[in-house]
Amino acid sequence: MSGKGAPELSVRNCGDLRVAVIAAQWHEKVMDGLVDGALRALHELGIDEPTLLRVPGSFELPVVAKVLAGRGYDAIVALGVVIRGGTPHFEYVSQGVTLGLTQVTVDTGVPVGFGVLTCDTEEQALDRAGLEGSNEDKGHEAVTAAVATAATLRTVSEPWR
């Protein structure tokens, strides 16, 4: 299972961060779990007014993330699902989304939490969606990673003493 060995991140003093969550609409049940996990994580971190935007699919996540990164957000979380089918479409979309979101982070300095599931089957996606009986909660994990990185960036941006 991919969740083994995940770090336990301690994130404090982040309630004033501006965070946006962008969620694709394909695979509604999986997406509902990812969004719920993301919003729960934000609430636990004291971030009670995040921006939540929906896009048609995972391929649209990078362009919206790039625009939001230029609008003063401290962290962005991208949530989506790409499930392998019988054509090369899976590889193209997975690679495009991954590279696109990475490029947004590198170009803008705004962390983008990667909550895009790339799975062989819908069952694998459901098992990672944070639903009752799921083994993992990737929406929650993506928020924690993005906010922890934003908090680190805030620390290194402060003047050295």
Curated annotation (Swiss-Prot):
One of its GO terms (cellular component) is riboflavin synthase complex. GO terms for molecular function: 6,7-dimethyl-8-ribityllumazine synthase activity. Pfam families: DMRL_synthase. (2S)-2-hydroxy-3-oxobutyl phosphate binds at residues 86-87, 128. Transmembrane segments: none annotated. It comes from the Bacteria. GO terms for biological process: riboflavin biosynthetic process. Keywords: Riboflavin biosynthesis, Transferase. Its EC number is 2.5.1.78. Belongs to the DMRL synthase family. HAMAP family: Lumazine_synth. Catalyzes the formation of 6,7-dimethyl-8-ribityllumazine by condensation of 5-amino-6-(D-ribitylamino)uracil with 3,4-dihydroxy-2-butanone 4-phosphate. This is the penultimate step in the biosynthesis of riboflavin. NCBIfam families: lumazine-synth. This is 6,7-dimethyl-8-ribityllumazine synthase. It comes from Streptomyces griseus subsp. griseus (strain JCM 4626 / CBS 651.72 / NBRC 13350 / KCC S-0626 / ISP 5235). The lineage of its organism: Bacteria, Bacillati, Actinomycetota, Actinomycetes, Kitasatosporales.
